[in-house]
């Protein structure tokens, strides 16, 4: 039976609240401390304890920086909008290096970097720049690194397989940050909600209830849109916020059990494919005959990291019969400028063609099925009451490497095991 987590965000969500709730669910404190120590970060300490919010007993997780009595990043997170002090500037590569050099589990590393990427993408979109151009005084601060890695470590320790998220209850008004006075929800939160299928619900509470770090955690770990029609509660964890609100400032986390008799299936926490509706997209094209394969590969990576829906090269012949490549990028209207910036910066081209297209895309999801070789992720698409199944290449490759069997044999065997849904 998989561990299914439900986060009830009726007072919003922030990084420290998420960690607190997971610790209260039973995540191992010693494992967490050892994992954080392996990050080799200095200038902070963590405090874990209990406090009451509107009479409700809750766990708290505070990151205290040198020279600070308390760490008040909940709902006014230093997190993503520093108010001064400890001005650490790191880019996404620096943060990935810290994570990769740590001793946390591979699953925790993957999830930590996924959460950071969600924040980075949202901030890049807000500022109109590429992800690798953002210098994260926001998520690069020690307290935010600790919050995000701690959340990933706790989720891994609890062996969470499926995650459902309630509506994110957000405050209203404005909040002061390094960039000035911003409306609530702040741009990064709005971008995360829009890009990741989260639901926002505005309340009368003044100020910020949903922080970018909290929203990014929710976006990165969510695997299902709805709760089961009937479920049992196996365990409850309650995480405390810092601010005192008219209502209980808590985040409740439930380990639940689906009471319906379904075939066993899980959705991987690490990733899932978002459904794409019919609509418009943009195609950017340019012909390149004087670039190295390394630079073209690097450009493709940058484009995909910064939100391109698809990137591909086509071999062509240009004037004077010179062999060349046509670079094609498919993206949303909002990402056109970012894509152009990356192409001009990393290739030798001096011009880009672009045009708007319409497309029809089948809705799909990734689920996990049990096979004779173990669990395999399968992409499931539907069209005119027909369901199509496509085993994930990386899982087939892994099984082939583990068993020594041929690719087609494993692929065919997985295709026969259509026990999803």
UniProtKB/Swiss-Prot annotation:
Keywords of the record: Lyase, Nickel
Molecular-function GO term, any one: lyase activity
Role noted for this protein: Involved in the biosynthesis of a nickel-pincer cofactor ((SCS)Ni(II) pincer complex). Binds Ni(2+), and functions in nickel delivery to pyridinium-3,5-bisthiocarboxylic acid mononucleotide (P2TMN), to form the mature cofactor. Is thus probably required for the activation of nickel-pincer cofactor-dependent enzymes.
Cited NCBIfam families: nickel pincer cofactor biosynthesis protein LarC
Keyword Lyase carried by entry: yes
Cysteines paired by S-S bonds: none
InterPro entries with a match to the protein in the record: Ni_insertion
EC number(s) stated in the UniProt entry for this protein: 4.99.1.12
Reaction equation(s) it catalyzes: Ni(II)-pyridinium-3,5-bisthiocarboxylate mononucleotide = pyridinium-3,5-bisthiocarboxylate mononucleotide + Ni(2+)
Family: Belongs to the LarC family.
Protein name: Pyridinium-3,5-bisthiocarboxylic acid mononucleotide nickel insertion protein
BP GO annotations: protein maturation
Alphabetized Pfam families for the sequence: Ni_insertion (PF01969)
EC primary class: lyase
């Amino acid at each position: 039976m998989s561990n299914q987590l439900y986060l009830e965000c009726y007072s919003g969500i922030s990084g420290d609240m998420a960690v607190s709730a997971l610790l209260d669910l039973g995540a191992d404190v010693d494992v967490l401390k050892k994992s954080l120590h392996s990050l080799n970060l200095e200038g902070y300490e963590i405090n874990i304890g209990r406090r009451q919010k509107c009479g409700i007993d809750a766990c708290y997780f505070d990151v205290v920086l040198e020279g600070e009595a308390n760490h008040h990043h909940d709902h006014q997170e230093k997190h993503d909008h520093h108010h001064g002090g400890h001005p650490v500037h790191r880019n996404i590569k620096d943060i990935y290096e810290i994570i990769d050099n740590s001793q946390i589990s591979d699953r925790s590393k993957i999830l930590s970097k996924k959460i950071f990427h969600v924040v980075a993408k949202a901030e890049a979109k807000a500022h109109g720049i590429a992800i690798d151009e953002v210098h994260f005084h926001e998520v690069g601060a020690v307290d935010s690194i600790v919050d995000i890695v701690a959340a990933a470590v706790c989720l891994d320790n609890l062996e969470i397989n499926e995650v459902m998220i309630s509506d994110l209850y957000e405050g209203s008004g404005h909040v002061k940050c390094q960039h000035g006075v911003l409306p609530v929800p702040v741009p990064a939160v709005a971008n995360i909600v829009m890009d990741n299928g989260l639901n926002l619900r505005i309340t009368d509470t003044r100020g910020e209830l949903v922080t970018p770090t909290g929203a990014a955690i929710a976006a990165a770990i969510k695997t299902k849109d709805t709760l089961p029609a009937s479920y049992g509660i196996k365990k409850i964890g309650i995480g405390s916020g810092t601010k005192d609100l008219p209502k209980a400032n808590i985040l409740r986390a439930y380990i639940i059990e689906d009471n319906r008799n379904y075939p066993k299936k899980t959705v991987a926490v690490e990733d899932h494919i978002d459904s794409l509706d019919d609509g418009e997209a943009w195609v950017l094209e340019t012909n390149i005959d004087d670039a190295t394969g390394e630079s073209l590969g690097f450009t493709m990576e940058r484009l995909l990291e910064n939100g391109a829906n698809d990137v591909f090269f086509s071999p062509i012949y240009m004037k004077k019969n010179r062999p060349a490549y046509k670079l094609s990028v498919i993206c949303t209207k909002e990402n056109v400028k970012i894509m152009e910036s990356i192409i001009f910066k990393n290739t030798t081209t001096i011009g880009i063609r672009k045009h708007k297209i319409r497309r029809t895309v089948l809705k799909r999801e990734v689920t996990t099925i049990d096979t004779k070789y173990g669990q395999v992720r399968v992409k499931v698409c539907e069209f005119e009451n027909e369901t199509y199944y496509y085993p994930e290449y990386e899982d087939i490759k892994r099984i082939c490497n583990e068993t020594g069997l041929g690719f087609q044999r494993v692929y065919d065997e997985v295709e026969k095991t259509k026990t999803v849904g």
